[in-house]
């Protein structure tokens, strides 16, 4: 049984994240979606909200795979968090050459620290290649339609959050 660790901020989860997760489930028997907690950053959604949105999105998109996916948080090195959860694969999605350059450096450093954990690069599909959570937040905050870029649960939460920032 192979366990994959898919780290990210997922603020919010996008269709690009979902695309990579579906691919990861074709390679690993279990995938841990790991939300990184960075004390210096102010996310739009709290950890609890992001975890709920991920779980709702997965229940809608992949109902038969729900038991194979778990959502956790981490605030330490990715390789240490992956090891703690018994993962032997780190999943990284790639949109373009810029992502590849950055991820190759990270994979090299991770391999030095944890040679027992392999990095698996998964290319984004054509439809999800331009999507970033940052752009989704920017477009949504300016009143743009992001329905093509995020799962329905995320769209609903984004709409509510941006209409009432206290949520």
Curated annotation (Swiss-Prot):
Residues annotated to bind ATP: 9-10, 17, 93-95, 103, 128-134
Pathway: Cofactor biosynthesis; coenzyme A biosynthesis; CoA from (R)-pantothenate: step 4/5
SUPFAM superfamilies referenced in this protein's UniProt entry, alphabetically: Nucleotidylyl transferase
Enzyme Commission identifier(s): 2.7.7.3
GO MF, one annotated term: pantetheine-phosphate adenylyltransferase activity
Family: Belongs to the bacterial CoaD family.
The name this protein goes by in its record: Phosphopantetheine adenylyltransferase
Organism whose genome encodes this protein: Rhizobium rhizogenes (strain K84 / ATCC BAA-868)
The gene coding this protein: coaD
């Amino acid at each position: 049984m192979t366990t994959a660790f898919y780290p990210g901020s997922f603020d919010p989860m996008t269709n690009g994240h979902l695309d990579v997760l579906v691919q990861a489930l074709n390679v690993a028997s279990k995938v841990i979606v790991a939300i990184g907690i960075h004390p210096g950053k102010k996310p739009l959604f709290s950890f609890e909200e992001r975890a709920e949105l991920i779980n709702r999105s997965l229940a809608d998109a992949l109902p038969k795979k729900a038991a194979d996916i778990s959502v956790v948080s981490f605030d330490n090195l990715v390789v240490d968090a992956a090891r703690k959860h018994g993962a032997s694969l780190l999943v990284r999605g790639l949109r373009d050459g810029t992502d590849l350059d950055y991820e190759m450096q990270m994979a090299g450093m991770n391999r030095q620290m944890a040679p027992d954990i392999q990095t698996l690069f998964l290319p984004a599909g054509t439809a999800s290649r331009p999507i970033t959570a940052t752009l989704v937040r920017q477009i949504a905050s300016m009143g743009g339609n992001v329905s093509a870029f995020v799962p329905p649960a995320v769209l609903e939460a984004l709409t509510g959050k941006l209409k009432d920032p206290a949520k």
